[in-house]
Amino acid sequence: MKKKLLALSLVLAMLSACASTPSDSIAATPTPTEAPAPAAEPTPEPTSNPSQTPAPTMAVYDEVSFDDWRAAAGCTMPDYSFSAPHTPQPFEKVAWPAEGVTLRTYVADTLEEAAELYHTTVETLKELNPDYEENYTRNHGQYWGLKLQAEPYTLPMNNVVSVTVSAPWVENQYDRTGTYNVPASLDKQAQAALATAYYFQYKWCGMHGGFWPYEPVDDLPKWLQGYATDGAFYTKFSEFSSFLHGVYSDAWVDDLLNEEPALFAEGENDTILTGDGDRGSNVAYCGHLFTEPELQPDGSVEFWQLVLICESEEFAGWGGEEPVVPDTATVMPIRLVPTEDGWRVNGVNLPN
């Protein structure tokens, strides 16, 4: 039986680097259905002026195939299967909004950071959010949920590919497999890298934190609980490091392994020291969509993950007969950076 060794309040702090939207309550995610999606509509851009585009700084690399990327990982990688491209499908009790949604930011430390992330200006953010100072104080020194444009935002219905990621050696059946939608216009290697990031973070660095099973060890630093044993995703730190660097940018990996308190650390004899904990999810989560990935002047690829939430006071959970219609989209930018060995994910926030 897996031990819950940390109080939820501590766990939420430990998972902050890997977490997604703020946790309101714990609820099962509604099951997607095969209901047809509405026809795509033109997606208006935010009305603000875009910030200055970055100067080209990254080298140009030849495309790396999915098979070559997986073979060169330097560790045992999961198995993958890819669906055909398809339109996004709503959850069983969700209806796509017909009249657009309120577009909001995720989180930023400063207005300048928010303006750069969301391609707008500080002046526009202040105009759209007259309570921005209260927002900063209320959220303990950060900006959350700033409005990005005055008019309703029409959701894009860009095609996605469903990627199933499976690690058959993992002991916990729930952690063994996951299926995640990614933009269909990414190449296969980029699709696999992004789906793997979702898989890793949902299973061990987001909804749950840390590998299991593990052997408890006393007197470890901070919230580390023991070292991963057979049946865990990885048991050797060298393999785990190769996995991380094969999926994520070096900068993201450095942040993960050097954060305080640490969720993972290298132990003696190439072992993996691991934490252990869980967090809740947002009961009003209604799914997520993507904008179309765009190549940036610096060589990276960027797009938005649009996290759909129902903020209406009339929302009373998922037990009613009427479908739930999301009214807000939280924008979480995703960036893939090129390397000689293929695309790497420069961090991704879980949509829920």
Where are these regions (language model features)?
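Exposed beta-sheet edge and beta->alpha loop/turn motif
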Residues: 279-352
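Ser/Thr/Gly/Pro-rich low-complexity, disordered linker/stalk segments of secreted
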Residues: 36-57
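Core segments of small alpha/beta cavity-forming domains
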Residues: 175-277
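Extracellular LysM carbohydrate-binding repeats and other cell-envelope/extracellular binding modules
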Residues: 76-101, 122-172
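Bacterial lipoprotein signal-peptidase II cleavage site
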Residues: 19-28, 35-37
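C-terminal motif of bacterial Sec signal peptides marking the signal peptidase cleavage site
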Residues: 14-17
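Positively charged n-region of N-terminal signal peptides that target proteins for export
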Residues: 1-9
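Primarily a LysM-type cell-wall glycan-binding module
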Residues: 61-64, 69, 86-122
